Amino acid sequence: MLSGLQNPRQAAAQLMNFALILSTAFMMWKGLSVATDSPSPIVVVLSGSMEPAFQRGDLLLLWNRNMWQETAVGEIVVYNVKGKDIPIVHRVVRKFGTGDKAKLLTKGDNNNADDTDLYARGQDYLERKDIIGSVVAYFPFVGYVTILLSEHPWLKTVMLGIMGLLVVIQRE
């Protein structure tokens, strides 16, 4: 089964193929980031705070269109909070001002209160720089794999093991 790896050229070719796949995925991610003007053009809904609009596990496509058009009340945005690593998907419920100086207040559709408790200490509203992007499309439950991998770390090990085994036994 592993006799094909005795040839160093075959092993090097498989390693190069694996590196090519990884670099292609990275370039596609960076290209999508540039095209959407968003550092994270794809996010997964991690909680039920936006139900019924989005369910936990939905995959969202973002576009930072606010360079051409201002964020409007009712728009669903993804934003970062200073000091927290996880982006939040919520709807804009109030807007004060225009342009880069606009102040935005957000709230999850399934939440009773607005997001002021989620914002950084001393921050009452979001600013333009806090917005990662606006939701332009979604794929239901496609991102649930990400949630499973984060909630069950042993699944990562199993998946990486299977992928590694496939690389080793693959024959050209």
UniProtKB/Swiss-Prot annotation:
Write one Pfam family the protein is assigned to.
Peptidase_S24
Q: Which reaction does it catalyse?
A: Cleavage of hydrophobic, N-terminal signal or leader sequences from secreted and periplasmic proteins
* List of catalytic residues: 49, 90, 115
Mind listing the UniProt keywords for this protein, alphabetically? Endoplasmic reticulum, Hydrolase, Membrane, Protease, Signal-anchor, Transmembrane, Transmembrane helix
InterPro entries per the record?
LexA/Signal_pep-like_sf (IPR036286), Pept_S26A_signal_pept_1_Ser-AS (IPR019756), Peptidase_S24_S26A/B/C (IPR015927), Peptidase_S26 (IPR019533), Peptidase_S26B (IPR001733)
Q: Could you list which ranges are Lumenal topological domains?
A: 36-172
Topology versus the membrane: Single-pass type II membrane protein
Which GO molecular function annotations are given, in alphabetical order? serine-type endopeptidase activity
Major localisation = endoplasmic reticulum
Topological domain ranges for the Cytoplasmic compartment:
1-14
- The answer on whether this UniProt entry bears the keyword Hydrolase reads yes
Which ranges does the record mark as transmembrane? Answer: 15-35
In residue numbers, the region (C-terminal short (CTS) helix) covers 158-169
According to its UniProt entry, the protein's GO biological process terms are:
protein targeting to ER; signal peptide processing
Query: Broadest EC class?
Result: hydrolase
Q: What is its EC number?
A: 3.4.21.89
Protein's cellular compartments: Endoplasmic reticulum membrane
Q: Name one GO cellular component term.
A: signal peptidase complex
What is the similarity comment for this entry?
Belongs to the peptidase S26B family.
Function of the molecule:
Catalytic component of the signal peptidase complex (SPC) which catalyzes the cleavage of N-terminal signal sequences from nascent proteins as they are translocated into the lumen of the endoplasmic reticulum. Specifically cleaves N-terminal signal peptides that contain a hydrophobic alpha-helix (h-region) shorter than 18-20 amino acids.
Q: What is known of its domains?
A: The C-terminal short (CTS) helix is essential for catalytic activity. It may be accommodated as a transmembrane helix in the thinned membrane environment of the complex, similarly to the signal peptide in the complex substrates.
Q: How does it assemble?
A: Component of the signal peptidase complex (SPC) composed of a catalytic subunit SEC11 and three accessory subunits SPC1, SPC2 and SPC3. The complex induces a local thinning of the ER membrane which is used to measure the length of the signal peptide (SP) h-region of protein substrates. This ensures the selectivity of the complex towards h-regions shorter than 18-20 amino acids. SPC associates with the translocon complex.
This chain belongs to the protein called Signal peptidase complex catalytic subunit SEC11
Upper classification of the source organism reads: Eukaryota, Fungi, Dikarya, Ascomycota, Pezizomycotina
